[in-house]
Amino acid sequence: MRCSLQFLGVLMFWISGVSGDIVITQDELSNPVTSGESVSISCRSSKSLLYKDGKTYLNWFLQRPGQSPQLLIYLMSTRASGVSDRFSGSGSGTDFTLEISRVKAEDVGVYYCQQLVEYP
């Protein structure tokens, strides 16, 4: 059976910090995705999120309809506890991708990226 799933990536954060502003943008993705396919969601930062400790402070969240956001990926590519290996994160200092393989109906929701380098 083929079912069409809707994914939505959105603009997440404009964070003011002492070193200047970091603007995080996501391309809106609302194209239908067929169950079993793969989908990529991109996120871009106006500044590098590679911190002086060598870690990249970029998180990915999924907010399913009627639920609170769930952490999927932290430090750019580390899956949170209990998150399926169908979810993977990758990227560089400013450009990031969340890849979802073998999409399922339960993956429907709003996907957010978040930076943790600067705080308001």
Swiss-Prot record:
InterPro entries: Ig-like_dom (IPR007110), Ig-like_dom_sf (IPR036179), Ig-like_fold (IPR013783), Ig_V-set (IPR013106), IgV_Light_Chain (IPR050150). Disulfide bonds join 43-113. One of its GO terms (biological process) is adaptive immune response. Residues 21-43 are annotated as: Framework-1. Residues 60-74 are annotated as: Framework-2. Residues 44-59 are annotated as: Complementarity-determining-1. Residues 82-113 are annotated as: Framework-3. This is Immunoglobulin kappa variable 2-112. It comes from Mus musculus (Mouse). The gene is Igkv2-112.
